Amino acid sequence: MKMNIHCIQGSHQNEILYVNDDPFEKANMIKNCISKCDRIFFIDFGINVDDESIKQLFQPHDNTSVLVFPGVVDGIDWDLFKKKVREGSSEPVSQMGLNFDTEIAQKVQKDIYKVKKTNARTWVMMTKSVNKKSKKIYAANMFDRLMEDGNKIYAFTASKLTMTYAHECLSNILGAAGVKTN
């Protein structure tokens, strides 16, 4: 919805496509869109994108093939949390035990970093940059293969994605097994 508002305000055309969670269907969708779109904005299921990240979609990003929006990986790494607390980390407590889907390298500009490795679930692809360098989009290790082909992938580290993870309630699991709970 927020992206549509930005598109209307900036007189940008957009098309919304839905795809199943199958990695091959996702790769097929990207292949089909790469020749007819200037940019592909991909948002995986259960992710809400903040306004600052959406504004990045409309920035020029010259010499960039893909801009990823780093997100949190499911679960809390308690060993990492303990380590950071003991070291007196200046990182916010709410982030100390979290791992992210993107590993970054050197800073390029404010909030934009070069990517070492990523498995981002939200990203924007500048198709004209990618189209020149990569003939195929692969379902497995898409970002690794794009980097191998010489594509430049950067991360917008100021993104604040809200990621929803499905967890089963313990009482539902027990109830399905025939255990009565009060």
Stretch-by-stretch model annotation:
Residues K2-I43, I47-K55, Q59-D62:
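Active-site-proximal specificity loops/subdomain of glycosyltransferases
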Residues D50-I137:
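Conserved catalytic core of nucleotide-sugar-dependent glycosyltransferases
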Residues E25-K31, W78-L80, T164-E168:
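Short, solvent-exposed polar/charged micro-motifs at secondary-structure junctions
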Residues D22, V72-G75, A158-T162:
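Short beta-alpha junction loops
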Residues I112, K117-N182:
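C-terminal catalytic/acceptor-binding lobe
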